[in-house]
UniProtKB/Swiss-Prot annotation:
InterPro entries attached to this UniProt entry: TMUB1/2 (IPR040352), Ubiquitin-like_dom (IPR000626), Ubiquitin-like_domsf (IPR029071)
Pfam families xref list: ubiquitin (PF00240)
Residue ranges of every copy of the Ubiquitin-like domain listed in the record: 173-246
Subcellular location: Membrane
Major subcellular location class: membrane
One term under GO cellular component: membrane
The protein's name: Transmembrane and ubiquitin-like domain-containing protein 2
Region (Disordered): 88-130, 146-165
Domain of life (superkingdom): Eukaryota
Source species of the chain: Rattus norvegicus (Rat)
Length: 319
C-alpha cells in the first residue's frame, strides 16, 4: 500500500516538474542561450561607455588646445605691446641729472662703461624684437596703424579738420525723404525753395503722382516755401507715390469718389435691417402655419433671436 501511494505521488508531481523544466528551457532567441545574451549585452554596454569617454576626451583636448593657443596669442600680444611702450619711452628724452661734484673719476668711468654696455645691448635686443613687432602690427591690421598715424598728427591740424568738416553751410538744409518701404533719400535744399521746386528737383516728371506729408499734414500747395512750413535741417518728409491712373487733377474731383463711397456704404447698411426683418417674418409665418416642423429648442431659439434683434434695432434708431 505504501509503495502504491508513493507511485501515485510521483505521478502527480511529474507534470509540475516537467512544466518547470519547459519554462527553464525557454530562451530569448532560439538557438542562443540566455548566458550568451547577457555576456553580449555587457560587452556592448562596455563598448558604448568606452566610445563615449573617448569622444568626450577628444573634445576636451581640442578645447584645451584652442584655449592654449588663445592664451599664448594673448601673452605674445601683451609682450609685444610692452616692448612697443618701452621703445616709445626710450624715444622720449628724459631730464638729465648732473653728477654730484663730489663724485670721483672711478664712478664716472663705471657709469660710462654701464651706459656703453646698455647701448650695445639695446640694438641687439631691438633687432631681435623687430620681427615680432612687425608680426604684431600685421595681426592687428590697418586700424592700429591708422590710430598711430592719427595720434602722431598735431592737435592744431585735427582741430582745423574737424571745424571744416562739421561746419555746415548756413544757406542749405538736409531734408530726409522717407518712402513707404522704409527707404530714405537725402535731399539738399534751401529754406527759400518751394514744395514744387523740391518735387521737380528730386521727382522729375512725377510731380502730380508724388504726395509729400510733413508732421501728418499733406503739402498740397506747391508755392509754399520750406521755411514757411517750419521745415528745418534733418527734418523727415514722408513721400507717397500714387499709381499713374490715380493722379488727381483738383480737390473737387478728389472729393467726389469719397462721397460716392460713403453714400454706397449708407445704402448697404440701411438695407441690412429690412432684409433681416423680412427673414424673421418669413420664419415666424412658417412657425405659425407649420408648427409640426418646429421643435421646442427651435422655437426658443427663434424667440431669442427676435428679442435680441428688437433690442438692437431700438438701440440703433432710438437715439
Amino acid at each position: 500500500m505504501i509503495s502504491r501511494h508513493l507511485q501515485n505521488n510521483l505521478m502527480s508531481v511529474d507534470p509540475v516538474s516537467s512544466q518547470a523544466m519547459e519554462l527553464s528551457d525557454v530562451t530569448l532567441i532560439e538557438g542562443v542561450g540566455n548566458e550568451v545574451m547577457v555576456v553580449a549585452g555587457v560587452v556592448v554596454l562596455t563598448l558604448a561607455l568606452v566610445l563615449a569617454w573617448l569622444s568626450t576626451y577628444v573634445a576636451d583636448s581640442s578645447n584645451s588646445q584652442l584655449l592654449g593657443t588663445i592664451v599664448s596669442a594673448g601673452d605674445t600680444s601683451v609682450l609685444h605691446l610692452g616692448h612697443v611702450d618701452q621703445l616709445v619711452n626710450q624715444g622720449t628724452p628724459e631730464p638729465t641729472e648732473h653728477p654730484h661734484p663730489s663724485g670721483g673719476s672711478d664712478d664716472k668711468a663705471e657709469e660710462t662703461s654701464d651706459s656703453g654696455g646698455d647701448t650695445t645691448g639695446e640694438p641687439g635686443a631691438r633687432g631681435d624684437m623687430e620681427p615680432s613687432l612687425e608680426h604684431l602690427l600685421d595681426i592687428q591690421g590697418l586700424p592700429k596703424r591708422q590710430a598711430g598715424l592719427e595720434s602722431s598728427r598735431p592737435e592744431a591740424s585735427l582741430g582745423l579738420d574737424d571745424s571744416t568738416c562739421l561746419s555746415p553751410s548756413p544757406s542749405l538744409i538736409n531734408v530726409r525723404l522717407k518712402f513707404l518701404n522704409d527707404t530714405e533719400e537725402l535731399a539738399v535744399a534751401r529754406p527759400e525753395d518751394t514744395v514744387g521746386t523740391l518735387k521737380s528737383k528730386y521727382f522729375p516728371g512725377q510731380e502730380s503722382q508724388m504726395k509729400l506729408i510733413y508732421q501728418g499734414r499733406l503739402l498740397q500747395d506747391p508755392a509754399r516755401t520750406l521755411s514757411s512750413l517750419n521745415i528745418t535741417n534733418n527734418c523727415v518728409i514722408h513721400c507717397h507715390r500714387s499709381p499713374p491712373g490715380a493722379a488727381v487733377s483738383g480737390p473737387s474731383t478728389s472729393l467726389t469718389p469719397t462721397t460716392e463711397q460713403s453714400s454706397l456704404g449708407v445704402n448697404v447698411g440701411s438695407l441690412m435691417v429690412p432684409v433681416f426683418v423680412v427673414l424673421l417674418g418669413v420664419v415666424w409665418y412658417f412657425r405659425i402655419n407649420y408648427r409640426q416642423f418646429f421643435t421646442a429648442p427651435a422655437t426658443v431659439s427663434l424667440v431669442g433671436v427676435t428679442v435680441f434683434f428688437s433690442f438692437l434695432v431700438f438701440g440703433m434708431y432710438g437715439r
